[in-house]
């Protein structure tokens, strides 16, 4: 396969469950996830990551760049991007919930929206969907891939469990 260009870009999203911290065992789990899934980009939510976070993970240290958008509450976002991809035009929100960047004419995004069913939380999500994200996406590429932990609440009355093939909410 030498000399051939990779035809598929593997993009994954993973919530690290920040309340449990990011001890070395979990760092190795992230590294194994990247290896097993052959990830080119791994978007993380509930992350508090700095330049030293993965220093014990040789594969990540050698092959990935880290873009982090930490939050005061330690529930931020981060994106691990393979070193052979040229990242441009990085933009983040001020609360650690959004990372947007471009690679080779494509916009990529990592979102971690507020959770909860109370009025403040719902209003926060609506503000991201209706105002913040559209503003961040102005002048971006016409093609893109954006995802993450959107913390959208499913109304069980409108969508009974039979529609989710055993997935529990």
Residue ranges and their predicted role:
Residues 1-57, 75-77:
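N-terminal, active-site-proximal structural segment of metallo-dependent hydrolase catalytic domains
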Residues 8-19, 103-119, 147:
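Active-site-proximal beta-strand elements of phosphoester/diester hydrolases
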Residues 11, 87-88, 143-144:
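Hydrophobic anchor at the start of a short beta-strand
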Residues 16-23, 90, 121-126:
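Short, flexible loop segments at the rims of nucleotide/cofactor-binding pockets, characterized by
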Residues 32-44, 49, 53-67, 127-169:
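Metal-dependent phosphoesterases centered on the DNase I-like endonuclease/exonuclease/phosphatase
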Residues 41, 47-116:
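Structured beta-strand-rich core segments of catalytic domains in phosphoester-bond hydrolases
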Residues 93, 97, 101-102, 123-137:
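Internal catalytic-core helix/loop-beta-alpha segment
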Residues 112-127, 161-163:
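Surface-exposed cleft-lining segments at the edges of enzyme active sites
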């Amino acid at each position: 396969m030498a000399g051939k260009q990779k035809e598929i870009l593997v993009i994954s999203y993973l919530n690290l469950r920040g309340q449990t911290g990011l001890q070395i065992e979990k760092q190795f789990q992230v590294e194994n996830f990247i290896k097993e899934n052959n990830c080119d980009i791994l978007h993380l939510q509930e992350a508090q990551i700095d330049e030293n976070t993965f220093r014990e993970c040789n594969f990540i240290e050698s092959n990935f760049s880290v873009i982090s958008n930490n939050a005061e509450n330690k529930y931020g976002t981060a994106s691990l991007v393979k070193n052979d991809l040229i990242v441009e035009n990085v933009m983040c929100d001020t609360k650690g919930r959004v990372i947007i960047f471009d690679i080779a004419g494509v916009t990529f995004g990592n979102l971690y929206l507020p959770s909860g069913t109370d009025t403040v939380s719902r209003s926060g999500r609506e503000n991201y969907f209706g105002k913040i994200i559209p503003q961040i996406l102005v002048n971006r590429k016409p093609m893109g891939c954006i995802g993450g932990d959107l913390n959208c609440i499913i109304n069980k009355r409108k969508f009974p469990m039979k529609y989710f093939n055993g997935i529990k909410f």
